Amino acid sequence: MSIKTPLQISHPLEFYEDKYRKAVAPEWDLRILNNVFDSVVESDIENMYENIFSEIWIDNFKKSYEFSKANFKRVQLYLTTPILYFSAELTWLFSAQVVPNDEIISDKFWKKIFAFPEMVLSSKRSKPFMKLQNIIFDENLLDNYRKYLFWDDDLFYKVYDIETIGHEFGHTLWLDIDTQSIMNSKTWVFKNIEEFKATTGWLVAYFMGKNDDDLLSESVIRDHVIRTIWLLSYKKVNEIEPYYCEALIHLSILNESWIISLDNNKISLNFSNYDNLKRI
């Protein structure tokens, strides 16, 4: 955790290989800095956190507020590209990670966020267009998503910063030092709500920010909708159940806001209901 050079070494990462002990597979790699853009999402996340705590009175939750804020301020962000890696299963590489996922260790050694924007963009572009996508989503939604994905690197990186890096920053907040251990000692449901919390963090931060770029907002929500539907595929994968739980909650919110609808048995995006989503 103390290494701050352009070459970064990962630790065993958060891949849910053992559903009983919540153990992780051995995943090691060497990463090199690749700053393809300047991340700006950190300030939005911090402003959201401060504003919400000011509304609910910081003094009522002072210990939790100060612990999370201290963790947040000590996060190191690295935009990188993996150059060497060893893994038990190459099934989740790479989107982004915040490490370590233990608050006691983090209290001593801080946290790092690793992001892989260029690799993620390249990976998404290399995937074939699937018939299943055309069965699930309407043509207009897919066409606009593919234009954004293939024709506008800068827009993609802005969305990646807001969603993916914002998600990882969201993991560092709304925690006390023993939150995870207490929840898991009783029900093992910490991760089942933690992924939803992290995604909701960047959503609320974006909604509370001064964002008047409709193209960016529509791209952000479209990507969020597609990701939510995709996460439903984890229904029967017990090791990564938290992402399915997250998807169910977000799908309920998307439906309630009417920002998505089912037209001719296909999901369409109704961006005109964006304000409904923000209110909910």
Protein language model features and the residues they cover:
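Contiguous, non-catalytic segments that form substrate-binding/exosite surfaces or channel walls
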Residues: 1-148
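Short acidic (Asp/Glu) and glycine-rich catalytic loops that position anionic groups and cofactors
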Residues: 140-146, 177-182, 225-230, 257-260
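Short, contiguous acidic/charged loop-to-helix segments that flank catalytic cores in large enzymes
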Residues: 152, 185-193, 238-239
